[in-house]
A protein has these predicted regions:
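Periplasmic/extracellular, small/polar-rich flexible segments of pilin-like filament-forming proteins
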Residues: 2, 67-161
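N-terminal leader/signal peptides at the extreme start of proteins
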Residues: 1-16
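Alpha-helical hydrophobic helix detector
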Residues: 21-38
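Residues at secondary-structure transition points
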Residues: 13, 45-49, 53, 109-113, ...
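Internal alpha-helical transmembrane segments of multi-pass membrane proteins, especially GPCRs
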Residues: 14, 19-23, 44
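Alpha-helix exit/C-cap motif
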Residues: 45-49, 57-79
Length: 161
């Protein structure tokens, strides 16, 4: 009997108590509640950057098109080197659609272009999470280089951010 009690006393108890485990879970919850919104904001901003880059790339292609066809711009994306363009084919990671608008097009309704010119608009895909971005809903640029954005953030915030 004495031998058993000597063995038990020489081996300390191992493991975590319930309180220690609850403290760790509480700390992890606090860290996640801070980290996840920050991460989502970062992701949202990177997708905005992708949309702005696509709009500016397409505007550059329009200007190159005009240099070889000096009479008019085009609203046909295939003429600009884009294939698979349209409502069923979002650009980049798949969060935005690009639209090329001529003066006769009403798709770029907030800022329709004047004649002869163009306007390019990136709008979020309705089924993607970027459609919930209320600050910067859509991005557009016209043939004069003027940039526009819709959403609560406004043009200066959305194009500067």
């Amino acid at each position: 009997m004495r031998l058993r009690s000597a063995v038990r006393s020489s081996c300390p108890a191992m493991g975590f108590t319930l309180i220690e485990l609850m403290v760790v879970v509480a700390i992890a919850t606090i860290l996640f509640s801070i980290a996840i919104p920050s991460y989502m904001s970062y992701i949202r901003q990177s997708r905005r950057t992708e949309a702005k880059t696509a709009v500016l790339d397409l505007a550059g292609r329009e200007e190159r098109f005009l240099s070889t066809n000096p009479t008019a711009y085009t609203d046909v994306p295939a003429n600009l080197g884009y294939t698979g363009f349209g409502a069923g084919n979002p650009v980049g990671s798949g969060y935005y659609y690009l639209t090329v608008c001529s003066p006769a097009t009403v798709a770029c309704a907030p800022n329709p272009p004047a004649t002869p010119s163009y306007s390019i608009m990136a709008t979020p895909v309705a089924t993607q999470s970027q459609a919930n971005d209320a600050q910067c809903t859509s991005f557009s640029v016209d043939s004069t280089g003027q940039q526009f954005a819709t959403g609560t953030g406004g043009t200066a915030y959305c194009w500067g951010n």
